[in-house]
Curated annotation (Swiss-Prot):
The keyword Metal-binding applies. It comes from Clostridium perfringens (strain SM101 / Type A). It comes from the Bacteria. It catalyses: adenosine + H2O + H(+) = inosine + NH4(+); 2'-deoxyadenosine + H2O + H(+) = 2'-deoxyinosine + NH4(+). Belongs to the metallo-dependent hydrolases superfamily. Adenosine and AMP deaminases family. Adenosine deaminase subfamily. The keyword rRNA processing does not apply. This is Adenosine deaminase. InterPro entries: A_deaminase (IPR028893), A_deaminase_dom (IPR001365), Ado/ade_deaminase (IPR006330), Metal_Hydrolase (IPR032466). Substrate binds at residues 14, 16, 170.
Length: 332
């Protein structure tokens, strides 16, 4: 299989974790942000995870510099455009980019301006490249419940205009789900689709709760459903798609190597999986490389690839019209 040339669907990709190193250097200079060095390799060390990373919390520290750089509309528009551009070059036909609007208000932008800027970058890229994109608005679990209401209130105005879903992200604690039951009910009623980061660390029950209490249609990662039989069976029976990011899971020590990752086992047991990068820069990987690693490890064939692709199309939050077009890309 020529994996580079095959069409791809990416459903789990964080904007601020996928910033080009050279762009970070330019923006740091433009914004007057002092770094110890502006040399490429030194700045890369600030953005890309090291082999010494020991946990998800350690991994999340790589988002500090991007947060400082993405406080102006033109900067957000640029990185959104560049992410779409990078994805298109490896034949990603559709991507759902997620980011947390409330992290970009430090220099006076409103949430409305933040969301508009990212959508503008996505739409601009669609004019130049054979790729389509939409936005998922992430809310951070270490922020207040009220902050989720704020995101819903502003974000609902962009449903059908570039925003498709809401997400809960950040550090994961056991049993985090229950306090979000009412606010996620409001999100669904406001037109948001729902995907939730859960089971990324060792808590399979979080996945079950996210589906049953929050109405999650997809799960970000879902790695640890194997340690909760009820969660495993629920995901399988309901056809919930797991947005799986093996390299990221290795980086955060969820698993130690590709051979230990359950993605292929889940796939062969008819659990719906999507393969994504999570954070292209932080994990230093693109989607073609991720597929190559999975292919080498588990010897997936074209039928496996096609099934994952079509499952990903069905699990996407885009329009039915676009889904039909995306399906045609893989019919060979």
């Amino acid at each position: 299989m020529n994996l580079l040339n095959l069409p791809k669907i990416e459903l789990h990709c964080h904007l601020d974790g996928s910033l080009r190193v050279e762009t970070a250097i330019e923006l740091a200079k433009k914004e007057g942000i002092k770094l110890h060095s502006y040399e490429y390799d030194k700045v890369k060390e600030l953005l890309v995870i090291s082999k010494e990373c020991n946990s998800l919390e350690d991994y999340l520290n790589r988002f500090a510099l991007p947060a400082k750089l993405l406080q102006r509309p033109e900067n957000l528009e640029r990185v959104a455009f560049e992410l779409m551009e990078d994805a298109s070059k490896e034949n990603v036909k559709y991507i759902e980019i997620r980011f947390a609007p409330l992290l970009h208000l430090e220099k006076g932008m409103t949430q409305k301006e933040v969301i508009e800027s990212v959508i503008k970058g996505i739409r601009k890229a669609e004019e130049f490249y054979d790729i389509k994109g939409n936005l998922i608005l992430s809310c951070l679990r270490h922020h207040s419940i009220d902050s989720v209401y704020e995101v819903i209130e502003e974000g609902k105005n962009f449903i059908g205009k570039g925003v498709v879903a809401i997400d809960l992200a950040g550090g994961e604690l056991e049993g985090f789900v229950k306090p979000y039951k009412e606010v996620m009910k409001l999100a669904r009623e406001s037109g948001f689709r729902v995907t939730i980061h859960a089971g990324e660390t060792g808590y399979g029950k979080n996945v079950r709760d996210a589906i049953e209490l929050l109405g999650a249609e997809r799960i970000g990662h879902g790695l640890f459903i194997f340690n909760d039989e009820e969660a495993y069976n629920l995901v399988k029976e309901k056809g919930v798609t797991l947005e799986m990011c093996p390299k990221s899971n290795i980086d955060t020590k969820g698993v130690n190597k590709y051979e230990e990752h359950p993605i292929y086992k889940y796939h062969k047991d008819n659990i719906r999986v999507n393969l994504s990068t999570d954070n292209r820069t932080v994990s230093n990987i693109n989607l073609t490389e991720e597929f190559e690693n999975v292919h080498k490890t588990f010897n997936i064939d074209f039928e496996d690839y096609k099934k994952i692709y079509l499952n990903s199309v069905e699990a996407s939050f885009c329009s039915e019209e676009l889904k039909e077009k995306l399906k045609l890309s893989i019919i060979i």
